């Protein structure tokens, strides 16, 4: 948004620098084609709302898409009211009413003429809308009767042309209608009267219904293109309205280009209707009217049914304007129009004042551009993004209560006792204390502490294991001999040494047989194996040092 606002004043300043002639309506060389035609058609549609009568609204509903003629000419209706028409007169009247509604220009004059045995002028030539409405009302009330003498109708039309259009001021268009075959003398008289009308500048069209002869009506008309034959009766006459209106109408609808350049040669293309009514192409004239005294006529270079190409007059000054008229009969009559052409300078400035304002504003424009170039572009901070709300963390469900621990496995059963050589301490004297110990671990200090001093005279024996063939020995027993209070002479073989008394090496110690008589052991004691015998040769206790943790023997026990 900031960049658009910055360039806005400069853009407005640039528009002010544009030369003023570019904004003028006539500065552009070409306008859209047919713009005046659309304007005139719009005016014609508004004028159509002012018509009255029982058939006008119905006609407008049915013929809104049809051609609306805006030319300037005289239109004559010559209608058959002979007895052969009979009850079809109302259909004939509706056809006339719808055709009249297509000619909306106030410059078009109309005349209603009927014929049978004699001719009758129902509506003299007029452009008054009220008189045309009254003429339609009188036409509707007519009762058909008499013979079919078309020449009587042409005589009445020639009288109107000579009275109201002396000097061939405007073109005359005649629409002659019949419903049957003409007798021979009536046909010949009609041909003569039609030729008189052409000499007066009239164009003759014929519309034939029911029992007509095609060669008769073609001879009466200007050409086969001017003939409208209806095969399906009077009600089908309304199908010819559009085609008839486009051919009968003489008007100029638009011109290209509407604006030309001063001093340059050019051609104008004139668009309109009724160009097929020309008798000879060399009789067509394009007239350019500047004013009452300045008129230029040119011959067209090409013509078709709806347009013609004419060389335009040279224009010397900007702003000059001329109107266009066309003649199809070598200048006898011209049909007028409101189409005009205007000259312009086409962008060439003849006045130096046009440059004054741009020269004054040019420094301001340069200053504005210089400031824009020097201005530092300020980068806008990026928009602050709003922190998105973190979704609330769902509280985890409480853990399930711990399952009770599985029951402990039952303790393994104690190993079965091994029947090996146990260690047996035999008390030979009356020791007050333990008389026997099994499974002594460690050193012999414990054994000496448990023995009574009075039992020290008993020699101990060490039994060698049966499966290992080793003797229990202590390292300190080989180095020193200390006399313990309760130790007999105990010894170990020097070759069999062990740092400690293993748990799996039990033995049997019991007194020597030299000093003490063996006593019978209780029955609960285990039996001594036969290989556990012998006397220790070396004393044990004298060589063992006292352990710091060993207790002195209790002599009172």
From Swiss-Prot:
Localisation: Membrane
Topological domains, Cytoplasmic: 367-557
Main localisation: membrane
Biased segments, Polar residues type: 534-557
Pfam entry (one): Anth_Ig
Residue ranges occupied by any VWFA domain in the UniProt entry: 74-244
Binding site for a divalent metal cation: 82, 84, 148
GO cellular component: cell surface; plasma membrane
Ranges of compositional bias, category Pro residues: 396-411
Protein name (database record): Anthrax toxin receptor-like
Organism this protein belongs to: Macaca fascicularis (Crab-eating macaque)
Taxonomic lineage of the native organism: Eukaryota, Metazoa, Chordata, Craniata, Vertebrata
Gene behind this protein: ANTXRL
